[in-house]
Curated annotation (Swiss-Prot):
GO cellular component: cytosolic large ribosomal subunit
InterPro entries the UniProt entry points to: Ribo_uL30_ferredoxin-like_sf, Ribosomal_uL30_bac-type, Ribosomal_uL30_ferredoxin-like
Transmembrane segment boundaries: none
Family the UniProt entry places it in: Belongs to the universal ribosomal protein uL30 family.
Source species taxonomy: Bacteria, Bacillati, Bacillota, Clostridia, Eubacteriales
Protein's name according to its UniProt entry: Large ribosomal subunit protein uL30
Keyword presence, Signal: no
Matches recorded under Pfam families: Ribosomal_L30
Length: 59
């Protein structure tokens, strides 16, 4: 599996509760926090849901 580098680039303030929960499930709690999960279908679905808040790169 490929690894992804996901960075939160926009604030979670004022977002829908399920979008905040999705970001927290990915481990993204603060702006500019970065995580490197495996590119599983579950993670890709979470990214698609909140892609307007993220910067995603393949590692």
């Amino acid at each position: 599996m490929a690894k992804l580098r996901i960075t939160l680039v926009k604030s979670l303030i004022g977002r829908k509760k399920d979008h905040i929960a999705t970001a927290n499930a990915l481990g993204l709690t603060k702006i500019r926090k970065t995580v490197e999960p495996e590119a599983t279908p579950q993670v890709q679905g979470m990214i698609k849901k909140i892609e307007y808040l993220l910067k995603v790169e393949e590692v």
